Design a protein with these regions (language model features):
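Metal-cofactor-dependent catalytic cores
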Residues: 1-267
Length: 267
């Protein structure tokens, strides 16, 4: 098994960045979802509500990022705000970037603000984690791993149903592996996985939502692959595709993983 691709999403819900190599921090890949657009109530806005976010291209730079050509500095002295990634999630404190308010509001066509997670220690992982595990603005876990063979299985179901196959981008993974049998990742839960020279804990399966129906290049919304997952991959935990990982590295440490490196499920 090998790593076939690596991806980050600098702003939650935005278009992906593809990488040949990525630095692993305790809370995920470097630069992944440290920013989030929120509504006036401080709740995150994602592609669930705003598929237009597929057209938001965010590129990190030292001390900030560039959004579709609009430069935003990290608001180190920006106002602190109590936010929620989802309305039902616990609150956390992050800083707002007032200079970006007009830009993100115009982009979405609704009132919105841009938040930056300066301190990753403020958001603990709720379940299937160890004390001290933290996550950025990702849904719940630092990384999502998917398998090309499992995608092939989904696309076989789609073709049988008379639908077009979908690319892996629909599932917005961080790490994609090749060389494992379809659904082998189901058996890795509760174990450790080594990607290159870095070890991760396989925390839980990933329950999928309507974002999988959003074309990540056009923002158009359809019905698949969520309908196929509902028919073939429905479990008590939801409609499952991919697994959530937690880096098994100490606070303050970083490591690097690269496309082409081997991957191995450990005992």
């Amino acid at each position: 098994m090998r790593i076939s691709s690596l991806h980050t999403y600098p702003v939650k819900g935005c278009h992906r960045l593809d990488h040949d190599a990525a630095r692993v921090e305790p809370w995920g890949l470097a630069g992944d979802r440290r920013w989030m657009i929120v509504d006036p109530d401080g709740v995150g806005i994602t592609q669930r509500q705003a598929p237009v976010l597929t057209g938001l291209h965010a590129v990190p730079r030292p001390g900030g990022l560039v959004l579709n050509g609009f430069d935003v500095a990290e608001p180190e002295d920006g106002p602190k705000e109590t936010l929620r990634v989802f309305s039902a999630k616990p609150p956390l404190t992050a800083r707002l970037a007032p200079a970006a308010t007009a830009f993100v509001s115009d982009f979405l066509g609704r009132p919105a603000r841009l938040a930056w997670l300066a301190d990753t220690s403020v958001r603990p992982i709720a379940t299937h984690a160890q004390p001290g595990d933290r996550v950025s603005f990702a849904d719940g876990y630092p990384l999502l791993l998917t398998s090309t063979a499992s995608l092939d299985a989904v696309n076989d179901w789609l073709l049988e149903a008379g639908d077009e196959p979908v690319p892996m981008t629909r599932f917005r993974p961080n790490v994609v592996i090749t060389g494992a049998p379809a659904w082998a990742e189901d058996d890795w839960l509760g174990h450790r996985i080594r990607l290159g020279g870095t070890t991760f804990r396989a925390a839980k399966s990933c329950s999928r939502c309507v974002v999988t129906t959003v074309d990540q290049e056009t923002g158009e919304v359809g019905r698949q692959p969520l309908r196929a997952l509902g028919r073939h991959r429905r479990y008590d935990a939801g409609l499952l595709f991919g697994i959530n990982l937690i880096p098994d590295i100490a606070p303050g440490e970083t490591e690097v993983i690269r496309v082409g490196e081997s991957s191995l499920a450990l005992s």
